[in-house]
């Protein structure tokens, strides 16, 4: 939840008393024109920047830096290390989220098959198309099974077929997360 968030940049107020409460298991979208403050709010929630005033909560308690390990974030500005091999980089990113190497490889292989990119495991990132790289980044965002997912412009650069694939996976993840939280 975000309560009464205000954020100013120089002479521009990007967020003016914004409050939002998203129930567990829910899927929300932030809609608005360019410059409306969507990315600013996301950057505040993910603690990339701070609000000028207001409060943030995660599961009913004040949000703290260690909560970021329980959140998956796919930023609008995508970036992978171009010279690394795809699989090597995906394992590295999984390890940063606390997944051991063998478990990371197993989970990644499952996701790579689901997204039909298993043939790219040993290729360098620079050989990937923009859409393929975005699939890898989506996978590394959700791999550690975060309790909350935040996507900024998740469908940007995808063709219609892959937009549908990504939508399906986001909905499936939302359903799975709500089932776990309900204790089912």
Model-found features: residue ranges?
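Conserved ABC ATPase "signature" region
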Residues: 91, 95, 103-120, 171
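Conserved ABC ATPase signature
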Residues: 124-131
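Catalytic Walker B motif of ABC-type/P-loop ATPase nucleotide-binding domains
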Residues: 149-153, 158
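Helical segment within the ABC ATPase nucleotide-binding domain
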Residues: 163-178
